[in-house]
Amino acid sequence: MDKYECSICGYIYDEAEGDDGNVAAGTKFADLPADWVCPTCGADKDAFVKMD
């Protein structure tokens, strides 16, 4: 599974873990709702970059 980093605040979305905002573990970044935002700073999904 992949990880994505918020380019604004550095929050890391880990697909294997989901997030504390009712996103289940195993949820792919591409499958997050269009209105999902960074739980730390509120940035849109387009502020995230895939980590190597």
UniProtKB/Swiss-Prot annotation:
Cofactor binding, per record: Binds 1 Fe(3+) ion per subunit.
Listed InterPro entries: Rubredoxin, Rubredoxin-like_dom, Rubredoxin_dom, Rubredoxin_ET, Rubredoxin_Fe_BS
Cofactor(s) of this protein: Fe(3+)
Residues annotated as binding Fe cation: C6, C9, C38, C41
BP GO terms, sorted: alkane catabolic process
Domain Rubredoxin-like residue range list: 1-51
One Gene Ontology term of the molecular function aspect: iron ion binding
Superkingdom as given in the UniProt entry: Bacteria
Alphabetic keyword roster: Electron transport, Iron, Metal-binding, Transport
Record CDD domains: rubredoxin
Function as written in the Swiss-Prot or TrEMBL entry: Rubredoxin is a small nonheme, iron protein lacking acid-labile sulfide. Its single Fe, chelated to 4 Cys, functions as an electron acceptor and may also stabilize the conformation of the molecule.
Family, per entry: Belongs to the rubredoxin family.
Designated name of the protein: Rubredoxin
